[in-house]
């Protein structure tokens, strides 16, 4: 099950000086336009968001080569400029959503689309719209463990799985250590974003994103 690219926004990239939004029809196979109209830049920008060959440095964003040249110096001196390059909005197929909830054994994810953002300031990708119901997931898993009523009450108020590690054991919390260990399997991101949404993205969404291939010789 692959995600479907729904929309692309190009902000500042090569010949693109102003934001351009393009809706992508699933049936589109060809982009037609006049010479120097931006077709090559548009397609290469999309390709660089998730190129099929991770080792190809020609398809990684580079400020010096990709930012519009006549605005590059101003950009480098303007710390308030966010440095947006391109945003791709994807549709998550119903079948994948059902698979996620089935494998997690509780209905915690119902997002149908999200946006994948690339930025000159930070090479890390940012995502908009990937959210899950951490509270429902925590409560669901906690039912399998011997825990005190006070601890169960605290658990019912937790909004993120990364907070489970902070729970303090009461005398009746026979299984708290085991519960923490189980939750830790889903909250193991050392870079910061450490909720159930991250686990779902890494485990299910990211592998389902289409890879892009760009070439200009034929």
List where the protein language model places each region:
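Pre-Walker A-like glycine/lysine-rich segment at the N-terminus of P-loop NTPase domains
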Residues: 1-51, 62-72
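A common structural microfeature
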Residues: 19, 28, 83-85, 212
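Beta-strand elements of modular eukaryotic interaction domains
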Residues: 20, 77, 204
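Short, surface-exposed, polar/charged, turn-prone segments marking secondary-structure boundaries
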Residues: 35-38, 50-52, 58-60, 70-71, ...
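Conserved P-loop NTP-binding catalytic core
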Residues: 44-112
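Electropositive, glycine-dotted interaction segments
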Residues: 85-218
